[in-house]
């Protein structure tokens, strides 16, 4: 399938600063339609050039009635395509088209019930339940202080709540719709149906954005971009670089060389697993750099978390540079940049340069390398990357593995990093993860790991007193990693893990369980 086809039916989301904006985009992608997120003050020429079949105005933290409130470019309402305003997006639509927005005396945050009115094209036949009087009701998620007090000319009432008489409005002649609630969050139970109604039925988008089509499209573009040139990839064993490796190998075969820097701070047998998966099973050219001694020497005596991160980052770059300098024919450097990196680096007018954050697996690159950048995942969200990985033949337990920090165990060993500590921690962490999988709890937690504490504690083994190290288990549940709850793992499970760690690892005398949520604690300890 050609590049134009898969991107042809597309939606543009103008971002007014909502924490849920990326969620809107992910919901549209899940339907099978391509979309992009741009700042609300994007240049008008870019909006026209984008060629959207429909436009969505996101929510946002500002008040429409305030000075310098962000507004949609007026041309949005003149392009002749359907427009959906969500929360703030509805309010700015109302205000810009001649309606009126006021600061509501009753603010609405959280669950609400909305009554649908008028059998509009957007909400017709979409309901959670029906009242005895025959009114269709929707269970939704609200988050607003302002509300529309007067609709613009040509609009009719589409939805209301007890506190918000105009919770939805529609100009069906122009296909302009505004809803005060958030269809993109799971708490709005019919939200995905509403988004699909807008994107597919009202905007006329076909479902071309599928995993198979994305792979075909990516391969065609990589081949077109690279030609017969050689490509270099820093392979970390993480999800993004692993999927890039699999995709590039499928596209260009032996033109790809991966450099895998093993810094001695990986998980149990992870280095061997990376080599087994990519070099042996898939036949990819992988250069493994055994750099444990180099990293341990660089980290010796340093206890400050930020300085440790910088030391590990610099050491990684040095090792990568040394190896890549030996590869004379390479023209391209591949990276695992994904779409959230791109969105987060493009602010509104204040910083519209669209500079991509240096999310380099390889840190900074030496200027004399002069490599072109290849970022085959830069259009994809993390969940799309994972689906791509499975479709490309990577094992799902690798693709859906819990997040692991770039500095690895270096930030899970509190204080100074030593080889002895890393070896102890690796084994303890392996036991914890192994038991989580055996108890079918691994996929029920969002992230789980073990932390090595730089303290000793008294224990008794047999009749002997022992004075040795302490580790802490950490497991959390989260949707977005912005907030997280400590995982309420069963006591008998924790007891089993603790017993195994203390019995099987001679240098550990005590196991604790971290019951801190985020906030105030962070997920990682350093």
From Swiss-Prot:
Residues at which ATP binds: 236-242
Known catalytic reactions: XMP + L-glutamine + ATP + H2O = GMP + L-glutamate + AMP + diphosphate + 2 H(+)
Catalytic residue list: 87, 182, 184
Domain Glutamine amidotransferase type-1: 10-208
This protein's pathway: Purine metabolism; GMP biosynthesis; GMP from XMP (L-Gln route): step 1/1
Origin superkingdom: Bacteria
Coiled-coil ranges (or none): none
Signal sequence region: none
EC number(s) given by UniProt: 6.3.5.2
GO molecular function: ATP binding; GMP synthase activity
Domain GMPS ATP-PPase: start-end pairs: 209-401
Role according to the record: Catalyzes the synthesis of GMP from XMP.
Subunit description: Homodimer.
NCBIfam families: guaA_Cterm (TIGR00884), guaA_Nterm (TIGR00888), PRK00074.1 (NF000848)
Protein name per its UniProtKB record: GMP synthase [glutamine-hydrolyzing]
Source taxonomy: Bacteria, Pseudomonadati, Pseudomonadota, Gammaproteobacteria, Thiotrichales
Gene this chain is encoded by: guaA
């Amino acid at each position: 399938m050609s590049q134009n086809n898969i991107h042809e039916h597309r939606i543009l989301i103008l971002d007014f600063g909502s924490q849920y904006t990326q969620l809107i985009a992910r919901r549209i992608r899940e339907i099978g339609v391509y979309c992009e997120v741009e700042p609300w003050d994007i240049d008008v020429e870019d909006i026209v050039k984008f060629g959207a079949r429909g436009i969505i105005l996101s929510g946002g933290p500002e008040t429409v009635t305030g000075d310098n409130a962000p507004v949609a470019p007026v041309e949005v309402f003149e392009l002749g395509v359907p427009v959906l305003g969500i929360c703030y997006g509805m309010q700015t639509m109302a205000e810009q088209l001649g309606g009126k927005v006021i600061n509501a005396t009753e603010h609405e945050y959280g669950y609400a019930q909305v009554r649908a009115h008028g059998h509009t094209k957007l909400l017709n036949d979409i309901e959670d339940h029906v009242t005895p009087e025959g009114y269709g009701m929707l269970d939704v998620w609200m988050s607003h202080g302002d509300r529309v007090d007067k609709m613009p000319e040509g609009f009719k009432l589409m939805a209301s709540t007890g506190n918000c008489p105009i919770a939805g409005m529609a100009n069906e002649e122009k296909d302009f719709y505004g809803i005060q609630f958030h269809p993109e969050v799971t708490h709005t139970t019919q939200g995905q149906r509403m988004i699909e109604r807008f994107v597919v039925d009202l905007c006329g988008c076909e479902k071309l954005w599928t995993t198979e089509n994305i792979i075909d499209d990516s391969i065609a573009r990589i081949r077109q971009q690279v030609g017969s040139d050689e490509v270099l990839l820093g392979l970390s064993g993480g999800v993004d670089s692993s999927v890039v490796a699999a995709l590039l190998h499928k596209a260009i075969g032996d033109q790809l060389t991966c450099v895998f820097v093993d810094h001695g701070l990986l998980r149990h047998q992870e280095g061997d697993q990376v080599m087994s998966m990519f070099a042996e099973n898939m036949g990819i050219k992988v250069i493994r750099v055994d750099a444990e001694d180099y990293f341990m020497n660089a980290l010796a005596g340093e206890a400050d978390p930020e300085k440790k991160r910088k030391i590990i980052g610099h050491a990684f770059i040095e090792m990568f540079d040394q190896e890549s300098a030996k590869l004379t024919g390479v023209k391209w450097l591949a990276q695992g940049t994904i779409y959230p990196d791109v969105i987060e680096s493009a602010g509104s007018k204040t910083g519209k340069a669209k500079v991509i954050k240096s999310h380099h697996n390889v840190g900074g690159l030496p200027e004399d390398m002069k490599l072109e950048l290849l970022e085959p995942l830069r259009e994809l969200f993390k969940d799309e990357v994972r689906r791509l990985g499975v479709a490309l033949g990577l094992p799902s337990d690798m693709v859906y593995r819990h997040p692991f920090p770039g500095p690895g165990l270096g930030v899970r060993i509190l204080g100074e990093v030593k080889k002895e500590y890393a070896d102890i921690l690796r084994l303890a962490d392996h036991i914890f993860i192994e038991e989580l999988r055996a108890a079918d709890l691994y996929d029920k937690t969002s992230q789980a790991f073990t932390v090595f504490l730089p303290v000793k504690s008294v224990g008794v083994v047999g009749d002997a007193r022992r004075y040795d190290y302490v580790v802490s288990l950490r497991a959390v549940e989260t949707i977005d990693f912005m907030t997280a709850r400590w995982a309420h793992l069963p006591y008998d499970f924790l007891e089993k893990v603790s017993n195994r760690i203390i019995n099987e690892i001679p240098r550990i005398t005590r196991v604790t369980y971290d019951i801190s949520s985020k906030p105030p604690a962070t997920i990682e300890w350093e």
